[in-house]
């Protein structure tokens, strides 16, 4: 049983990063933000934890939003996938500056800049201490990068899906508009559904729930939180069918 006072640390994790964070709230890439994220990931990787990463592309394109402006949804989603690859390459560069060996694998083949997505090869990279960054989403339209993170985490045998956000975890209401909103420290997937809470998109959440993959939602903007999350410190919100309290 996982309790509010004690969580076990993890050896292989999937880190989901939103693309908007890479832009610092603007279009494009904010080098200071990416460098800070790279330093946090490097600290965790050098401690012996195997780290895989999926990054969104919202700082460049969002397929659903482009569709609302009249673009074909499939083509819009492919544009978003290319945006994720730009984020992946930026993170790879900053990780290498931190002395961390890193590989980018993409669901759309672009062999001059990245390996194709091969789960067995990705696992071998992780075993050798390399960080693996997955780009181009699922390689198909209509699938979010949340869903990509959940699917990749399951396929390469991660122990937890770490959802990095700009808030401290999952709240009963929007904490930006309701100062009385309650932060859940531990909660079951069933409670998430019953309370109508937002953790990840529906497909990603269903994948994790059906396959008993824990999700830890935490604040990336607090320096050192990736290491704390991996070590099992009581931060953020743990969504797990085995939690005993919250």
Swiss-Prot record:
<keyword id="KW-0067">ATP-binding</keyword>
<dbReference type="GO" id="GO:0006225">
    <property type="term" value="P:UDP biosynthetic process"/>
</dbReference>
<feature type="binding site">
    <location>
        <position position="174"/>
    </location>
    <ligand>
        <name>ATP</name>
    </ligand>
</feature>
<dbReference type="InterPro" id="IPR036393">
    <property type="entry name" value="AceGlu_kinase-like_sf"/>
</dbReference>
<keyword id="KW-0418">Kinase</keyword>
<feature type="binding site">
    <location>
        <position position="58"/>
    </location>
    <ligand>
        <name>ATP</name>
    </ligand>
</feature>
<comment type="subunit">
    <text>Homohexamer.</text>
</comment>
<feature type="binding site">
    <location>
        <begin position="16"/>
        <end position="19"/>
    </location>
    <ligand>
        <name>ATP</name>
    </ligand>
</feature>
<feature type="binding site">
    <location>
        <position position="171"/>
    </location>
    <ligand>
        <name>ATP</name>
    </ligand>
</feature>
<dbReference type="GO" id="GO:0033862">
    <property type="term" value="F:UMP kinase activity"/>
</dbReference>
<keyword id="KW-0547">Nucleotide-binding</keyword>
<feature type="binding site">
    <location>
        <begin position="138"/>
        <end position="145"/>
    </location>
    <ligand>
        <name>UMP</name>
    </ligand>
</feature>
<dbReference type="InterPro" id="IPR011817">
    <property type="entry name" value="Uridylate_kinase"/>
</dbReference>
<keyword id="KW-0963">Cytoplasm</keyword>
<dbReference type="GO" id="GO:0005737">
    <property type="term" value="C:cytoplasm"/>
</dbReference>
<protein>
    <recommendedName>
        <fullName>Uridylate kinase</fullName>
        <ecNumber>2.7.4.22</ecNumber>
    </recommendedName>
</protein>
<dbReference type="InterPro" id="IPR015963">
    <property type="entry name" value="Uridylate_kinase_bac"/>
</dbReference>
<dbReference type="Pfam" id="PF00696">
    <property type="entry name" value="AA_kinase"/>
</dbReference>
<comment type="pathway">
    <text>Pyrimidine metabolism; CTP biosynthesis via de novo pathway; UDP from UMP (UMPK route): step 1/1.</text>
</comment>
<dbReference type="GO" id="GO:0005524">
    <property type="term" value="F:ATP binding"/>
</dbReference>
<keyword id="KW-0808">Transferase</keyword>
<feature type="binding site">
    <location>
        <position position="62"/>
    </location>
    <ligand>
        <name>ATP</name>
    </ligand>
</feature>
<dbReference type="InterPro" id="IPR001048">
    <property type="entry name" value="Asp/Glu/Uridylate_kinase"/>
</dbReference>
<comment type="similarity">
    <text>Belongs to the UMP kinase family.</text>
</comment>
<feature type="binding site">
    <location>
        <position position="77"/>
    </location>
    <ligand>
        <name>UMP</name>
    </ligand>
</feature>
<feature type="binding site">
    <location>
        <position position="57"/>
    </location>
    <ligand>
        <name>UMP</name>
    </ligand>
</feature>
<dbReference type="GO" id="GO:0044210">
    <property type="term" value="P:'de novo' CTP biosynthetic process"/>
</dbReference>
<comment type="function">
    <text>Catalyzes the reversible phosphorylation of UMP to UDP.</text>
</comment>
<keyword id="KW-0665">Pyrimidine biosynthesis</keyword>
